[in-house]
């Protein structure tokens, strides 16, 4: 998959440590096209000391890790976004004012994909109070939830899945969301998602429901919060929404810590 923040973060970090970096563009690589993942892994593992992979299938990054013989970092798959979790955990620790195992956060929106899955597992591992607010059809898979609950039993974490946004955000220290349509999905799914999620936007009113004057807003970016992008303008012209998963008022408010997070 294409990347802005994840690629830049890896490249800057590597160069800060004196490492060289090679970027293989999705359209310019033969990975999975003319050459299998297994063969690619064994070639790159002989040339490089580490590999960061950002793509679609979780199985692909796991196969790379199995055969490369060097550390492989998951820069994002459809299922998980672990390096973003490092940034999210650090950001919450910086802004919480209390230990993470005494911190509550809510994720609002489409919870089937990498961000909600990863936040669920992250929160469970850190013993946090995790709430997912989403239509039941857009909840994480039963397998992911079961894994998170098993971890939470050991760490003292709490996990709540609910269709009620007010229940999800009540008492929360942080409110997360993400885009409603992911990379690679066709435009045709927008209408369906908007119909399902129109009551799951992060608005000033929803932030206030937390009852926490210090509640913070988080988003891994990019966000559709206004009409200042081609997609944002298309959404406005097609569906009449100025801002989708989050309003401009919340995104640009003092409660927003998205750029610290990014």
Swiss-Prot record:
Keywords: Amino-acid biosynthesis, Arginine biosynthesis, Cytoplasm, Transferase. Changing residue 157 to A: In strain: NCTC 10294. It catalyses: carbamoyl phosphate + L-ornithine = L-citrulline + phosphate + H(+). Changing residue 116 to G: In strain: NCTC 10294. InterPro entries: Asp/Orn_carbamoyltranf_P-bd, Asp/Orn_carbamoylTrfase, Asp/Orn_carbamoylTrfase_sf, Asp_carbamoyltransf_Asp/Orn-bd, Orn/put_carbamltrans. Pathway: Amino-acid biosynthesis; L-arginine biosynthesis; L-arginine from L-ornithine and carbamoyl phosphate: step 1/3. One of its GO terms (molecular function) is amino acid binding. Changing residue 121 to I: In strain: NCTC 10294. The record marks 94 as: Important for structural integrity. Transmembrane segments: none annotated. The gene is argF. NCBIfam families: orni_carb_tr. It is an enzyme of class 2 (transferase). One of its GO terms (biological process) is citrulline biosynthetic process. GO terms for cellular component: cytoplasm. It is found in: Cytoplasm. It holds the Pfam family OTCace. Belongs to the aspartate/ornithine carbamoyltransferase superfamily. OTCase family. This is Ornithine carbamoyltransferase.
